[in-house]
Amino acid sequence: GLAYDISDDQQDITRGMVDSLFQAPMNDGTHYAVMSSYEYISQGLRVPLILGIWGGKMGINPIMMSAGELESGNAGEPAKMCCLFINDLDAGAGRVPIIVTGNDFSTLYAPLIRIGVCTGIFRLVDTFPGQSIDFFGALR
């Protein structure tokens, strides 16, 4: 029955299989990944901080924070690990603006800033001004 459903709760709600207030039993369904992080924390293991962007039905809200909050207070120590988790990116990327700021993106991934790497992207944007992200994603 639905009480033992281990599929994605959000998908079941979308398909009308369950009421929007339905939550699977503990350790099942979508919320398992969030709840299971307690198992790591309780054992004193170091795990990345996971920031999730989810719908309100899971009771998890996005957290706005500065990268400075992840830095160590002691010079030379590594920063805290973190992960940005976006659920169902393919459905939301064309509807949600993604804004990234930074001082030196070469520290993130050097090949992205090599001369000539993004010229094709800029050429497409110049050729089709004012188009949404979905438009460029559909180009082949």
From Swiss-Prot:
Q: What induces it?
A: By water stress.
Intracellular or extracellular location(s):
Plastid, Chloroplast stroma
One GO cellular-component annotation of the UniProt record comes to: thylakoid
What InterPro entries does the annotation carry? Answer: RCA-like
Coiled-coil region: none
- Superkingdom in the source lineage: Eukaryota
A GO term for molecular function:
ATP binding
* Keyword annotations from UniProtKB, A to Z: ATP-binding, Chloroplast, Nucleotide-binding, Plastid, Stress response
Record function comment: Activation of RuBisCO (ribulose-1,5-bisphosphate carboxylase/oxygenase; EC 4.1.1.39) involves the ATP-dependent carboxylation of the epsilon-amino group of lysine leading to a carbamate structure.
Similarity field: Belongs to the RuBisCO activase family.
Would you tell me the protein name for this molecule? Ribulose bisphosphate carboxylase/oxygenase activase, chloroplastic
